[in-house]
């Protein structure tokens, strides 16, 4: 068979396959009827009603779950949703029965509708769900139902009645302090909250255009609306604090019907973070104090220390929490590091504070500082020329001064700079002088180097000078006696030397004569 013959054979086989596939699809469509068409909007609305039900009035109030109490009654004109079985279609009196076919024959499996689909005898029509009744209008509208404001700031939330049913109604404003958001990511303060959860408290009642009740204990915290205009009901808080944050509920009672409107109010304040590095002595370690002051809400801060950018273990820090009378919390963290050497450079100490304003909002604050390291001064006290002298070596210039402490009180003194410290550039040497006391007996002279920052200790040196009359009459007498004693000692030495010389002269001739006699034959 040539190439042309093979091409005709392939085309014939392909055409036969297409015809077979189309025939199979047609048979399958005839055996499986399509689902019934969806009902038109007119049928859905009519089938949703119940027998004898009346449509809702246009001005009926909306009784939604958030605006009505659980015990609130349903308005008379509101239709109830019909009870629809899961397997049976809804039966209503408002939908007419289906008309018989035009040819008078009952519908069967072989009878098709106008669009070609079976009109009966096939699959049963699934039940159509009934339409929910229309919602009532809300009786009260507020511009915001969840409000968050800064701490101690005034708050105003505009609310107003949306319907006309205000005459003769009793309006009440309730307040409840509740346990607000507490982040589990923050550190526990372990202190008592002065404003814990409390039961609801009635703040204000208005009826028939006059004030029926006003809380004497809490009323000064609010500005209540005027009873002459029951349609305008704003919520005004003079200062939003831990004592006034919570849930506020407007409630309207009209006979057996009770409606409510809830507004949730919360407050917050970010901490004021500061770091104060503590002065240190060479080789004594480092310390710093971090403060996160006056923050709210509780358990909303987390604190970490860093040394030269690296985290510091929590065991090196000690935290203390406090709460004031207004409900604001504060924390103080003291960091102590002992691994220091005399020649080490002071580190950079950083305090990071994470503050959780709400469940989904986190802000971070940090402060850092470097401790100042001081060298202990070298102090020495001695007495010279009727004066007490104090020498202080290697002290900060312009900051440190010398103070004398003596039993007889204050006496004239002077302090002067004698040079620079050779061992530590930038430090100087001081010399303080004070007259000796006129008090008889032993007297202690204490010299103190003042001006070092807290919490460094005071550096001092003490020496005792005995001015008893039995020993010396005065400082001048001491000098005279010393000179006399010296001269007396010199005189004694001269006398002794003269005596020895004379004795040597007397003995010398006798020895010469004896030697001469001994040498004669």
Curated annotation (Swiss-Prot):
Subunit comment: Interacts with host complement component C3; this interaction inhibits host immune response by disregulating complement cascade.
Gene3D superfamilies: Immunoglobulins (2.60.40.10)
Protein name per Swiss-Prot or TrEMBL: Envelope glycoprotein C homolog
Signal peptide: 1-21
The organism's taxonomic lineage, starting at the top: Viruses, Duplodnaviria, Heunggongvirae, Peploviricota, Herviviricetes
Function text: Essential for the initial attachment to heparan sulfate moieties of the host cell surface proteoglycans. Plays also a role in host immune evasion by inhibiting the host complement cascade activation.
GO biological process: adhesion receptor-mediated virion attachment to host cell; symbiont entry into host cell; symbiont-mediated suppression of host complement activation
Stretches assigned to the Cytoplasmic side: 497-521
């Amino acid at each position: 068979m040539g190439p042309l013959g093979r091409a005709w054979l392939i085309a014939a086989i392909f055409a036969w396959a297409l015809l077979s596939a189309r025939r199979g699809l047609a048979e399958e469509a005839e055996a499986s009827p399509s689902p019934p068409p969806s009902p038109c909007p007119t049928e859905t609305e009519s089938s949703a009603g119940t027998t004898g039900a009346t449509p809702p009035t246009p001005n009926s109030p909306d009784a939604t779950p958030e605006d009505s109490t659980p015990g609130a009654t349903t308005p008379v004109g509101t239709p109830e949703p019909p009870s629809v079985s899961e397997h049976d279609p809804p039966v209503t009196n408002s939908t007419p029965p289906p008309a018989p076919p035009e040819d008078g024959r009952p519908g069967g499996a072989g009878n098709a509708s106008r669009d070609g689909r079976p009109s009966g005898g096939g699959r049963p029509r699934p039940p159509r769900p009934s339409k929910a009744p229309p919602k009532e209008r809300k009786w009260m509208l507020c511009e915001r139902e969840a409000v968050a404001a800064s701490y101690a700031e005034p708050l105003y939330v505009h609310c107003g009645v949306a319907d006309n049913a205000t005459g003769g109604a009793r309006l009440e404003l309730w307040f409840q302090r509740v346990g607000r958001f507490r982040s589990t990511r923050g550190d526990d303060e372990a202190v008592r909250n002065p404003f814990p959860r409390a039961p609801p408290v009635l703040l204000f009642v208005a009826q028939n255009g006059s004030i029926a009740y006003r809380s004497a204990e809490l009323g000064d915290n609010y500005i209540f609306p005027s009873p002459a205009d029951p349609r305008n009901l704003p919520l005004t808080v003079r200062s939003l604090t831990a004592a006034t944050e919570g849930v506020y509920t407007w409630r309207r009672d009209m006979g057996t019907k009770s409606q409510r409107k809830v507004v949730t109010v919360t407050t917050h304040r970010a901490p004021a973070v500061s770091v104060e590095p503590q002065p240190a002595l060479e080789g004594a370690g480092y310390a710093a104090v971090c403060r996160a002051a006056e923050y709210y809400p509780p358990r909303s801060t987390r604190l970490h220390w860093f040394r030269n950018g690296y985290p510091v273990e929590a065991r090196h820090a000690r935290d203390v929490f406090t709460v004031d009378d207004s409900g604001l919390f504060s924390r103080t963290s003291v960091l102590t590091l002992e691994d220091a050497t005399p020649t080490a450079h002071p580190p950079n100490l950083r305090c990071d504070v994470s503050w959780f304003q709400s469940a989904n909002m986190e802000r971070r604050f940090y402060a850092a500082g470097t401790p100042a390291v001081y060298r202990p001064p070298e102090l020495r006290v001695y007495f010279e020329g009727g004066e007490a002298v104090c020498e202080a070596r290697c002290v900060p210039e312009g900051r440190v001064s010398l103070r004398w402490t003596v039993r007889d009180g204050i006496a004239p003194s002077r302090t002067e700079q004698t040079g620079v410290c050779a061992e530590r550039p930038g430090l100087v040497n001081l010399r303080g002088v004070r007259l000796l006391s006129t008090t008889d007996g032993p007297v202690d002279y204490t010299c103190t180097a003042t001006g070092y920052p807290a919490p460094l200790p005071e550096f001092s040196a003490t020496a005792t000078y005995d001015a008893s009359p039995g020993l010396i009459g005065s400082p001048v007498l001491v000098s005279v006696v010393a000179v006399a004693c010296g001269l007396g000692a010199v005189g004694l030495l001269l006398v002794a030397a003269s005596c020895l010389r004379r004795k040597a002269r007397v003995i010398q001739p006798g020895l010469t004569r004896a030697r001469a006699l001994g040498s004669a034959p």
